[in-house]
Amino acid sequence: MAGLPDKDKLIRNFSRCLNWEEKYLYVIELGAQLPPLTEQQRQPDNLISGCQSQVWIAMSTSTEGQVVFAGDSDAAIVKGLVVVVFILYQGLTPQQIIDLDVRPFFADLALSQHLTPSRSQGLEAMIRAIRAKAAVLKAG
């Protein structure tokens, strides 16, 4: 996902936001950078249940064994949250994704306390789905 910040830069950029409104706008800007999904990726298997908005997450592995992400949402803020999650898992293998708890990163970004309960539940559903898909990729 060329052009997206890495984890450290993401945290730095969030810390530079003066208030929650700026963070919200930054998340929306991140979402706008997601390339569109193909029709093949926009299949029911990639639709994440537990999200109020429609969210698709497709995962595959590169020749180096790293997970490659593609995703989309019909809601701008949720699309941005998809990108944030992808950034946190970027460059990892399926096993590393299974082992990594990204929740502390959301605490570092001060995102968790500013999301509505339904968005927090959706974020949790995305994380669970990514870890489950990583387990399937690992199993081959």
UniProtKB/Swiss-Prot annotation:
Keywords: Cytoplasm. InterPro entries: Cysteine_desulfuration_SufE, Fe-S_metab-assoc_dom. GO terms for biological process: iron-sulfur cluster assembly; sulfur compound metabolic process. Pathway: Cofactor biosynthesis; iron-sulfur cluster biosynthesis. Gene3D superfamilies: 3.90.1010.10. SUPFAM superfamilies: SufE/NifU (SSF82649). Its main location: cytoplasm. One of its GO terms (cellular component) is cytoplasm. The keyword Cytoplasm applies. Pfam families: SufE. It is found in: Cytoplasm. The active site is at residue 51. Participates in cysteine desulfuration mediated by SufS. Cysteine desulfuration mobilizes sulfur from L-cysteine to yield L-alanine and constitutes an essential step in sulfur metabolism for biosynthesis of a variety of sulfur-containing biomolecules. Functions as a sulfur acceptor for SufS, by mediating the direct transfer of the sulfur atom from the S-sulfanylcysteine of SufS, an intermediate product of cysteine desulfuration process. Belongs to the SufE family. Homodimer. Interacts with SufS. PANTHER family: CYSTEINE DESULFURATION PROTEIN SUFE, SULFUR ACCEPTOR PROTEIN CSDE. This is Cysteine desulfuration protein SufE. It comes from Yersinia enterocolitica serotype O:8 / biotype 1B (strain NCTC 13174 / 8081). The gene is sufE.
